[in-house]
């Protein structure tokens, strides 16, 4: 089990309360697909992903980005039980979708960039450290069924 300090919990939940899940989720997934184009193969059913403009304007990317970040909110609400919180999603991504677990780490890194861009004043080095820890823990929980 991961140990969270009171300060880490406050930094995570405080920033999360300001996050526009639809906007930041859409941006994070779009950035993942643009920066790491090989991840697009998992989203073939989303239609046109042929250019950054197409990806940014794709309503399915926006909707799924919101869904992904909404799910990430479950981690924020369950900091002391992230492994179990993501158990079913880990199984889905491993057994049915066959997603490379490295992609979870990549998305976490992208989320850090999105949060820093949206909340530059609040995203102090201490806040970044707490969020880096959180995205690592979430990525590990999502990759759990692969082991």
From Swiss-Prot:
Record keywords, A-Z? Heme, Iron, Metal-binding, Oxygen transport, Transport
Coiled-coil stretches = none
Annotated CDD domains:
Hb-beta-like (cd08925)
Highest rank taxon of the organism: Eukaryota
Functionally, this protein is described as follows: Involved in oxygen transport from the lung to the various peripheral tissues. The beta chain is a component of adult hemoglobin A and D.
Q: In which tissues has expression of this protein been reported?
A: Red blood cells.
Entry annotated with the keyword Lyase? no
Question: What protein name is recorded for this chain?
Answer: Hemoglobin subunit beta
The UniProt annotation places heme b binding at 64, 93
Q: Which GO terms describe its biological process?
A: cellular oxidant detoxification; hydrogen peroxide catabolic process
Complex formation: Heterotetramer of 2 alpha (or alpha-D) and 2 beta chains.
Q: Where is the Globin domain?
A: 3-147
Which molecular-function annotations from GO does this UniProt entry contain? heme binding; hemoglobin binding; metal ion binding; oxygen binding; oxygen carrier activity
Extract the PROSITE patterns matched here: GLOBIN
Q: One GO cellular component term, please give it.
A: hemoglobin complex
> Does this entry carry the keyword Iron?
yes
Q: Which Pfam families match?
A: Globin
What family, per the record?
Belongs to the globin family.
